[in-house]
Amino acid sequence: MNLKIAIIVICQLVYFTQGDTVPSKPLSVDYQAEFSWDLYKKLYPEFRRNMVISPYSLRKIFVCLHQLTDAKDPATTKFSKQLHKVFKFNPTGQLPDLVRRRYENQREAYAQDQGLNTTTLAVVLGRKKKTTHALNNLPKSCGIFARSLKSGSPKQMTRSLNAAMKNISNGAAQSFLSESDLNRDWDFFVADSWLFKGFWRYQFEEEYTTTCNFYTNAKKKGLMRFMYLEEMLRVGHFPQWNVRAVELPLHRESPFSCVLMMPVAADIEELIESLSHKRFKEIYDNMSASKTTVRLPQFRLRMKLSAKSMLEQLGFDTAFKESVFRVFEKDGAIPLGDAIQKMDLSMAHEGEDLAKTYVDRSLGQQFTAHQPFMFVIFDRKELVPIIVGNVVAAITPKDVGPQSDEKLCDNPPRFNGR
């Protein structure tokens, strides 16, 4: 059996929310954030469907894997150049202190919440030779553990890997890998798992849940359950940027938050194409608190992405095609088989506090996500996108009932794009 190594990254996110949001501080060029927006913008035209991804996590994986390379190896030089070109990261040998501190701060932020679990597991399969000091002692900010597993059938190896992941994550990660995820020709494998279930600052009012149409375009629609929330929220309407936005704060102790964005008139692709770290910061900083009614479809997105197929199209192929990573003390370097990211994201009613009861008759601001919209879950301190995604087609539940009357569906809203 060929040499096999698996690195499994699990980030189970049951995000919690903040109270009052502090306006962001002026930021210089943030390459971590810029890469997140760039990769998302490049992927959307290829998918053109409901999607969710964590570009931030993919970047962190490859930045940390650079610690397993030999600076004297020509393959490392090519790998470093591609890291700089594609991931906007300039490797300088050891993980720079600034990057190390940033990853450590983010790792500590994840650990603040009981519902958050992040685990990275490096697994050697079918090999008894001693692993390198570098593999076993990657920077703590990377959060990577190392394990060795015996070779066996795909079923046995999958079961062993899943058991190891479950054990290290304290039961949070279960049955992440399937037999089809393992390729016997791989030497090195990365699995990146994210689970997010929004636990909001304010609970959506379940008694006002309605079944209404979600419009993919002017002709195509489908039924979805829409959640209802009326509360003082940060909101913005910016025709100059073709965007309407609202912030759904997570639990008050969370360092993260969520912003929903819809185009004002043009198609969502034009909105996505216009986004960058600078533009998102402009949008976020210009939002203001106002009484706001939000109608958001209740949905769950699950997605599997191959980093290899995505990144090779962007010119990042050395890691997969050449022997770059040194994981054994007496053996040469080996390539990476793939980095598979699995996302499981749910938007549901659960929240920390009940929304306030308003006695005034003013309608306030309205944000009804009845047509293609995008969402970003981000670090409030630096506005770094952690998870980015979009809903462009109805996700109709199997047990959905008949459409609610027009009044409950806002008489009803219609698609306003092109």
UniProtKB/Swiss-Prot annotation:
Q: Which keywords does this Swiss-Prot/TrEMBL entry list?
A: Blood coagulation cascade inhibiting toxin, Glycoprotein, Hemostasis impairing toxin, Heparin-binding, Immunity, Lipid-binding, Protease inhibitor, Secreted, Serine protease inhibitor, Signal, Toxin
Expressing tissues:
Female salivary gland (at protein level).
Query: InterPro entries annotated for this entry?
Result: Serpin_dom, Serpin_fam, Serpin_sf, Serpin_sf_1, Serpin_sf_2
Question: May I ask which residue range the UniProt record assigns to the signal sequence?
Answer: 1-19
What CDD domains does the record point to? serpin
Q: Which domain of life is it from?
A: Eukaryota
GO CC terms of this entry: extracellular space
Localization (cell): Secreted
The answer to whether keyword Glycoprotein applies is yes
Glycosylated positions are: N117, N167, N286
Q: What is a single molecular function from GO for this protein?
A: heparin binding
Give yes or no: UniProt keyword Membrane. Answer: no
GO terms in the biological process aspect are:
immune system process
Pfam families with a match to the protein in the record: Serpin
Q: How does it assemble?
A: Interacts with host coagulation factor X/F10 (activated).
What family is this protein classified in? Answer: Belongs to the serpin family.
Q: What else is known?
A: Binds to heparin; binding to heparin does not affect the interaction with host coagulation factor Xa (F10). Instead, heparin may function as an anchor that targets FXa-directed anticoagulant to endothelial cells. Binds to phosphatidylcholine and phosphatidylethanolamine but not to phosphatidylserine. Heparin-binding site is also required for phospholipid binding.
**According to its UniProt entry, what is the function of this protein?**
Anticoagulant and antithrombotic serpin-type protein inhibiting host coagulation factor Xa (F10). Does not inhibit host uPA/urokinase-type plasminogen activator (PLAU), kallikrein, granzyme B (GZMB), matriptase, elastase, alpha-chymotrypsin, chymase, coagulation factor XIIa (F12), coagulation factor XIa (F11), plasmin (PLG), thrombin (F2), trypsin and cathepsin G (CTSG). Inhibits factor Xa-induced production of pro-inflammatory cytokines, such as MCP-1/CCL2, TNF-alpha/TNF, IL-1beta/IL1B, IL6, IL8/CXCL8 and IL18, in human endothelial cells.
Task: Please give the name of this protein.
Answer: FXa-directed anticoagulant
